[in-house]
A protein has these predicted regions:
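ATP-dependent helicase/translocase motor core
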Residues: 1-155, 159-167
Length: 167
């Protein structure tokens, strides 16, 4: 049966109340709730809100294609024997979209105000930057001022350097 799921980009698990997103290769403890349909939405406390938010926030056709195209990442197999597939969490999705727009605005207007991203330890900043870099490299080629950007990630710990090398 595993070969039937080889091309399954996302996996959603739910008991009707709690609903989590991952991939078929994601360990259970790394499945994550999608808590907002759109950036800025308030968290709902209604029963079954997680399921409805997941359906609207991930599985609407436009959003699903966007996640499938730009927010699923396969880690370099040089570093791991097993194929590692990573799907964005909702904060990474919205942060990378906002950062991309901020950078585009900064470049086009020449304001020099591209923005700053602050995230707590363990929130997935490295993956957020990978998703952002992918957006800038693949989805901004039609913006002459951006073209083919050079992207430099500066880290302050060996652990982050090793994590970034896997990207």
């Amino acid at each position: 049966i595993p070969h039937l799921l080889h091309y399954c980009p996302l996996a959603c698990i739910s008991d009707g109340v709690k609903t989590r997103l991952g991939t078929v290769r994601t360990p259970y403890e790394h499945f994550y709730a999608w808590r907002r349909v759109n950036d800025g939405d308030k968290l709902s406390t209604l029963p079954f809100a997680e399921t409805e938010t997941m359906i609207k926030g991930v599985y609407s056709p436009k959003r699903f294609l966007e996640i499938f195209r730009d927010y699923i990442y396969f880690q370099d197999s040089i570093y791991d024997k097993n194929e590692v597939e990573i799907v964005c969490r909702y904060p990474q999705f919205f942060a990378s979209k906002l950062l991309k727009q901020s950078i585009i605005n900064s470049v086009v207007t020449k304001s020099g105000k591209g923005g700053t991203y602050f995230g707590a330890t363990g929130c997935g900043k490295t993956y957020t930057m990978a998703f952002l870099a992918r957006q800038l490299a693949l989805r901004c080629t039609d913006i002459p001022q951006i073209g083919s950007p050079t992207i430099i990630l500066i880290v302050d710990r060996d652990e982050l350097q090793k994590q970034g090398a896997k990207l």
